[in-house]
């Protein structure tokens, strides 16, 4: 489909459940593939990125089978088989970076990792360099900075490493490698990042110590598979919450959504902007808090965002920009250097699309300044990025918008546009 046209939408009304959390699905599949025996991943995300993870793990000898909405995984007991072909990670940066950690200590195993054009442009040196310091043998384009990447499993030694910039993916890759290393592997973060890997280590009984911003692990022995329930993805829920906030008369409740505090920085910022939001944690699944969030239309005001919150909402910056476009006054969002190297250059993509909708925006090397007050109808480009496609469907919803190449939303949210239209129709 060339473009998806959303007519101006009246109030959004209703309740919904969003697909399973992408981060938890990736990590859950990987750990089940490492485990001994059989385990189920209930209500995972089944979309472009996570299906790439399933295919890669199958190529490494794990049995991954779909059972209705679930995955059944029979693990390899810490030892993967050497793949017969190149491992294609598609568009999934999380998969490629975590896989480097997973394979680095598989002694004697050889694998080549590649991905689509977008993934082959993304920086991998931030993972490769500390893995090499552990003894990993990894090579690739630009001295290992870009895929394709070749990995030859080797004996690893523990490492004490301080992340130069906050990155849950680098932290997770090193923790996974640490399961195969001699001695302790310790990662220190400059600021907290999402902690799904740590929670899943506890779920599976893997070695883990957390002390402030330091996380430690060490070599593990075989461990049994355990079933895992995946919560709804807060990053997917965020689009509907902001859609309700900016569309007059709206009230939307997202149920069964993950409310991990290392993921919900957006709620803090939206509340500071004057958003009418309520949420409650009802239960926990595999150490992950789960609950509901209600959003009602609100008259938002611009704010200066605390840069310390950005690692807790790094995937929600595009939809925060959508809220800022409708807010009264100026919103300043700093600390965005990581967004330059996501699926797209998200800082540039946000700025260009906001301008296309008549919003005044300034773009710096690692910041955005958005002068809100509303948008005009227009046509927006996803830049091959799922979160840009969905965020700009939301920002244009009250006035009407055309989204080019809407299929990019399928990377993380199959059925996104159908769910959006259903809530519009419910009013």
Curated annotation (Swiss-Prot):
The catalytic residues are 315 (proton acceptor)
Name the reaction it catalyses.
Answer: 3-phosphoshikimate + phosphoenolpyruvate = 5-O-(1-carboxyvinyl)-3-phosphoshikimate + phosphate
The UniProt entry's sequence similarity note says: Belongs to the EPSP synthase family.
* Keyword annotations from UniProtKB, A to Z: Amino-acid biosynthesis, Aromatic amino acid biosynthesis, Cytoplasm, Transferase
The record's subcellular location field reads:
Cytoplasm
A Gene Ontology cellular component where this protein is annotated is: cytoplasm
Q: Name the enzyme group at the top EC level.
A: transferase
Q: Tell me the organism.
A: Thermus thermophilus (strain ATCC BAA-163 / DSM 7039 / HB27)
* MF terms (GO), sorted A to Z: 3-phosphoshikimate 1-carboxyvinyltransferase activity
Q: What is this protein called?
A: 3-phosphoshikimate 1-carboxyvinyltransferase
PROSITE patterns in the record: EPSP_SYNTHASE_2
Domain of life, per lineage: Bacteria
Q: PANTHER family, alphabetically?
A: AROM/DEHYDROQUINATE SYNTHASE, PENTAFUNCTIONAL AROM POLYPEPTIDE
* Signal peptide positions (record): none
């Amino acid at each position: 489909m060339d473009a998806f046209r959303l007519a101006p939408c009246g109030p959004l009304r209703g309740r919904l459940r969003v697909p399973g959390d992408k981060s938890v699905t990736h990590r859950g599949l990987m750990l089940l593939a490492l485990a001994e025996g059989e385990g189920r991943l209930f209500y995972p995300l089944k979309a472009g990125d996570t299906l790439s993870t399933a295919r890669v793990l199958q190529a490494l000898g794990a049995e991954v089978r779909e059972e209705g909405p679930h995955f059944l995984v029979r693990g390899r007991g810490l030892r993967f088989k050497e793949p017969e072909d190149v491992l294609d990670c598609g568009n999934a940066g999380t998969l490629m970076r975590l896989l480097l950690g997973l394979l680095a200590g598989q002694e004697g195993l050889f694998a080549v990792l590649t991905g689509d054009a977008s993934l082959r442009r993304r920086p991998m040196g931030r993972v490769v360099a500390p893995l090499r310091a552990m003894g990993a043998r990894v090579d690739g384009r630009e001295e290992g900075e870009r895929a394709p990447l070749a990995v030859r499993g080797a004996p690893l030694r523990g490492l004490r490493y301080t992340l130069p910039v906050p990155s849950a993916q680098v932290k997770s890759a090193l923790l996974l490698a640490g399961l195969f290393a001699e001695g302790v592997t310790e990662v220190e973060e400059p600021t907290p990042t999402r902690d799904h890997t740590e929670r899943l280590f506890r779920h599976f009984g893997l070695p883990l110590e957390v002390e402030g911003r330091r996380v430690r692990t060490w070599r593990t022995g075989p461990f049994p598979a355990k079933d895992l329930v995946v919560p709804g993805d807060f990053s997917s829920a965020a689009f509907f919450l902001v859609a309700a906030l900016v569309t007059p008369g709206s009230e939307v409740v997202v149920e069964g959504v993950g409310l991990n505090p290392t993921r919900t920085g957006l709620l803090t910022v939206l509340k500071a902007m004057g958003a009418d939001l309520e949420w409650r944690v009802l239960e926990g699944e595999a150490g992950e808090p789960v609950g509901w969030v209600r959003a009602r239309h609100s008259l938002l005001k611009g704010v200066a965002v605390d840069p310390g919150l950005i690692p807790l909402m790094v995937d929600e910056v595009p939809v925060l920009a959508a809220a800022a476009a409708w807010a009264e006054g100026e919103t300043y969002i700093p600390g965005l250097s990581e967004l330059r190297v996501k699926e797209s250059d998200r800082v540039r993509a946000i700025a260009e699309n906001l301008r296309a909708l008549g919003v005044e925006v300034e773009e710096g090397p690692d910041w955005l300044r958005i002068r809100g007050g509303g948008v005009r109808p227009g046509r927006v480009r996803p830049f091959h990025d799922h979160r840009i496609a969905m965020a700009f469907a939301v920002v244009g919803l009250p006035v009407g918008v055309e989204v080019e190449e809407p299929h990019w939303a399928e990377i993380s949210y199959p059925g996104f546009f159908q769910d959006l239209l259903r809530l519009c129709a419910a009013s």
